Amino acid sequence: MAVLLLSISYSPVFAEETDDTGWVTENSNTYYTVNGKRVKGWRKIDKKYYYFDTNYILQKNKIVDSKKKGYYYVDRSGVRVTAPEIKYAVSFVMKNSSPKDSRSKRLRDCFEALCKYQYYRGWLDNDISAVSISAYAKYMFQNHRGNCYRYASSLAYIARVLGYDSRVVAGGVTAYAYNNLSPHGWCEVKTENTWKMCDCSMQNAHRDRNLFLVTRKAYPFRLRCDKAFTMNIKGGKVTWK
């Protein structure tokens, strides 16, 4: 009996060579194809907007696009976030830092720029809640002045659009040994798996100290932490918990 041997070779089929429409993941990068061709720029998919760079790669957790077309923040799933406070934060970052610099350098530049805003105690509020953070941040971005809670809230948005996890913390503080702790709020940013403080309002009052990205243990003043609110963004929507 004669056996006929057939030599069959398989060549790899890439996403752009198929007729499929949908998401494709290759080498840890995410793409979207329409009729087998990868897309770039903005794309509306299932009522949400996503941004693909010139290499067709989905961009995540960063500021994207251009000065001409406008800058936007996209969350960790790549969805464009349109909350007003996020838009203000993006504008602040683009105005006060350079895209050519490292993320940490940009955060530092933005921290210093925010510290130049006027400290203003024109409110009776001595506390902060999850529902008030967005309004506090919006006020600071619009009016360029605020108290400790407004500094903290706006910086939390700034840190997030730069790709950091961020939260707003409320408690008490004093720079004087025998004084009672005064109500206080500050921002914390997660870097190298550690939450670190960024305290704009106290930095304004104590220019000789470094209150940028310091641990609570290294913070030079007496401090009490009562509660923390972490920013969460999912599907383009911002919530605080």
Please tell me what each predicted stretch does:
Residues 106, 110, 144-159:
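Active-site nucleophilic cysteine motif
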Residues 112, 116-124, 141-143, 180-183, ...:
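Repeated polar recognition positions within modular binding domains
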Residues 9, 52, 98-100, 142:
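Conserved aromatic
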Residues 49, 71, 112-113, 154:
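Short, solvent-exposed alpha-helical surface patches in non-cytosolic proteins
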Residues 153-219:
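Hydrophobic/aromatic-rich core segments of domains that either
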